[in-house]
Amino acid sequence: MNAASAKTAAVLTISDSSYVGKREDVSGPAIVRELEAANFKVVHTSILPDEKDLIAARLIECSELTRLVVTTGGTGIAARDVTPEATLGVIERRVEGIEEKMRQEGAKKTPFAALSRGVCGVRGKTLLLNLPGSPSAAVESLQAVIGILPHALELLDGKTDH
């Protein structure tokens, strides 16, 4: 697998109920639409259960395939919300500013944004980004940072002229 294109992305929905077919995945397709509108080419989507090892393995696979891996779901404080832990286990560096920006924007709409534990980090030349599971919160969080993602990927490519 080769992360050749600067604007390729993968979208992973983390949800036990969507994984077993009890609930339709609405957040994943909404994120795909937002990314495509921002000229990202989404080359992989999948639905995974809230299982830390499975999430971590797919994050690694997708980071070798794409430049941006976006997850939705599993970022809250419930016992099975393990997406941040899986992400922290595979990234090399955190990008706290992106995390903070998403929570700040979310807090403008609801105080519950403070319960999101989503992280953002770097693995190789790939950016990994955790979004909330709620479709509206996922889209709003992505919209808060989507404008800076291309520049972040350029920086990961070593393009530091600015």
What is the role of each PLM region?
Residues 1-162:
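Non-catalytic beta/alpha edge segments that cap or flank active sites
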